[in-house]
Amino acid sequence: MTSTILASSQQTRFHIANSTMSSLSGTSSSSKDLDIPDVSISISNSDASDKKKGSKGSVAENEKEILADAHLKLSSGVHYALVGRNGVGKSTLLRAIGEKLIPGIPLDIRIVSMQQSYDNPEIKSAKDQMSQGEDVSVLDFVISSDQERTEALRRQKDLQVALDNTQDPTAAVRILRQFKFDDEMRVLDEAKKAANLRSGARGMAARKELKIIETRVEEKRVGLEIIDTQTLAEETNEAMMMLSDIEGFLEQMSPSAVESRAKLILRGLGFKLKSPPTVTQSLSSLSGGWRMRALLASVLFQPSDILLLDEPTNFLDLPSLLWLETYLQNDLPANTIVLFVSHDRAFTDSVAEEVLVLRDLKLERFPGNLTAYEETRSERQRYLTKMAEAQSKQRAHIQDTIAGNVRQAKSSGDDKKLRQAASRQKKLDDRMGYEVGSRGGKFKLNRDLPGYHLTSRAGIEGMIPKDEAGVKMMLPREPGEELRFPGPLISVEGLRFVYRQRGAGTVTVKEALSGVDLVVHPKSKLGIVGLNGAGKSTLVRCLVNQFSEGGGKIVSGSVKYHPAARIGFFSQDAIEKLPLDKTALQLMMASLGDDPGSASSQHEARSVLASVGLTSFTVSSVPIAKLSGGQKVRLALAQVLYPPPKLGPVPHVLVLDEVTTHLDADTVVVLAEELRKFKGAVVIVSHDRWFVRKVVELDGGEDGSAEGDEGDEDDVGAEPGVVYEVEKGRLVELKGGIADFEKKIRSRKAG
């Protein structure tokens, strides 16, 4: 069963933007803004791939709605952060925009996207080349990602070879006709897409245009090999002119300048240009994380009108992340639209100029970054709540006054007063509501509430921003078993760890860790930061005593464990190890003992999953393959907290390696609060500066949480933890915490 994205908009039934026709005619639309009303998007799990979205507002049972009559507006040159809970469809929306599935997106607009997946089309293309024996280097992969330039180079080569072919004078003509045929096929594909998106009179006109193009394509197909000697010289001259135009286009981008720009981007993302260079390594030799960096480099390298980035910071260390911040802020063309999703709050606040909030099937737009949005929303919520309460008291007072007047009128038989009371009641019902105009001044009905309404004022209660249901996550407060005697949980002393790399008859020893000392006490909160490749993951593997085959060994020093200590380990590849064909409930029930299928076992498994926010239909009917990245992280975290064979007991120490990857901002906030309340030890390896500050340093910075959070009570008397940096195989305590590390990185980049 495959998933299909179904998209519609107002453009479907009424009109397609003029830019769509301009792309078919070969011209380019001047504006690159997107302003599309009534956008509806859903995901269908039906096998019928040619199924179209039904009538407005109708959704089939096998469809999941992402947007319903939402307004999609992206302005030229603005950087947008797309935020929303895990599973609401942020990645689906980016894909729908990137693949131009939404009617009204101009076909000639250049959209470049990075998806949150190893199965990205660009990576797949590179893999196809590898399977055919055409392995590509990282640098070549990035340079060749500019498809317009790559196609121009291919045509230049083919035309030059054909024109130099003295044995076959018709070679250049055949190549010219093939190029024209390829261009017509692209126009045909666009015409089919435009015809499918239209209806009514415009749809009929589009289908007539499609018939004309199909006829033209068929004529060119037939004429590919039929060469008229009378037009041979004319078409050969046309081929020479095409070659001249292509060479003029390529002269504007010299090979040296192109390579320099590609190297600049790769270097910023952590690739080495020398000693030894990693930009010349084959793409197939890279790990998954470094392949995603190469993909990000290729996306940044390509010219674009709209740049879509889905979790671009997931595989970046702090230097690369800071470089990406600067690049997006300062080095993109001024009119480029950027729409990105990121769980890193510091990165989001730094890059975003506006926020798009995907909530309740709508897109809410806010001018400012994420922190400003949360502050403004909270302030408006408090302001309108107070206004509603005050007006409620005023309404009650007026209602009492009217009731008193009615009683007096009835007792005295004064019909005039009775009519007066009825008039006041009518005014109360019609005009009591929001009294502030759209410009902040006095309310004016025609300007501020146009159209037909049941009353002359909007109700205040309906204007108060509604809070989403809180992120559901309640981790255990303490380890499952009390230690019978005191002592450190993990003690590392003088640790030296090496890798042995075998070459052609030689063995190279690479030192990963040297002289490392570390003690994890029962209530320690420790943060470990450092550059990629510095040895963080190696240190973590030593702490949890998990090594891959041929993954090196400890040659001196020691790692000692409390004999009764239980260690829970969340690895970077935890979600990749999940069985995709099972449901979350099936996975957790398989961890139970003698009778995993019993009702009591199912209840226990559901309780465990509910503690990390996975409930109902999601755990029982949705295969793990269909879960969002954040939901998979929650499931993997549940396995760490409640290990088999009996779903427990809870470990004494949690070692979490990049656990915030794929989590939305709200979930990261709640996870940080829950880890602060955990009475066991926590060791965090993370590039998320905010997360380390919150959990380890007990920082109470901006997080969007409500005032007076109950988690503050758990911090009373608690001492901040310690942040360490792994640098060139050594472990160094950072006295100033994560701020010291960030300061060091920025000064190093400036130098």
What are these regions (language model features)?
Residues 1-386, 470-751:
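ABC ATP-binding cassette signature C-motif
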Residues 7-9, 424-427, 432, 460-462:
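Interdomain "pre-motor" coupling segment immediately N-terminal to P-loop NTPase/helicase cores
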Residues 382-426, 435, 439-451, 742-751:
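ABC ATPase nucleotide-binding domains
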Residues 423-430, 451-457, 536:
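Eukaryote-specific, cytoplasm-facing alpha-helical/coiled-coil scaffolding segments in long proteins
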